[in-house]
Amino acid sequence: MVGEIPVLLIMKKPIVVSGDVSVYDVAKLMVEQDVPCVLVVCERPNHESIEVATDKDIIKKVLIRKLPPDKVKVEDISSGKLVTIPPNTTIDEALEIMNKYKTNELFIVDDGKIVGVITEEDLIKIAPEIISTLKELVNYLLQIIDEVTSGDISDKSKEIQNINQGKDNKKDSESDIRKKKIMLIK
């Protein structure tokens, strides 16, 4: 199922900017690259940190306050609260983590390095595939219900029991028996 896919297969390479870049330039880059967030390398006294700036940060911390985006540095609005996950995290697990930490982006860390980002938007884009898979599952379950109510399954079940007990043909090999079972299921 789609939810079992590891985020490694759908993650994107994160965009990294210097903390002294203007919010205007970062917003322009985000629009050009069609991404809702960037990693920000901030040079702080005595240390360097990696933070995140999102489109929501720009709206809440700059635009709503009517600050000039070309004068505000991105490091002044970025946050050090990165939520990280390993590359083998499944999509279902990623959604749970996003909900738990109330975040729209997760950063994928491998061997201590940020190697990717997955956003809520990325997960929404694959939602049609999830819906399609769920529809297939529902149709399959409805088919089983129909077979059970029509008695077809019990007939197949008896045939499989006969095959297992060797009543069908004692000369059949294991491979032949498997093939017969598969044909019954189909």
Curated annotation (Swiss-Prot):
PROSITE patterns attached to this UniProt entry: CBS (PS51371)
Domain CBS: from-to ranges: 10-69, 77-133
Signal peptide: none
Record InterPro entries: CBS_dom (IPR000644), CBS_dom_sf (IPR046342), Diverse_CBS-Domain (IPR051257)
Alphabetical keyword list: CBS domain, Repeat
Name listed for the protein in its UniProt record: Uncharacterized protein MJ0450
Source organism (scientific name): Methanocaldococcus jannaschii (strain ATCC 43067 / DSM 2661 / JAL-1 / JCM 10045 / NBRC 100440) (Methanococcus jannaschii)
Taxonomic path: Archaea, Methanobacteriati, Methanobacteriota, Methanomada group, Methanococci
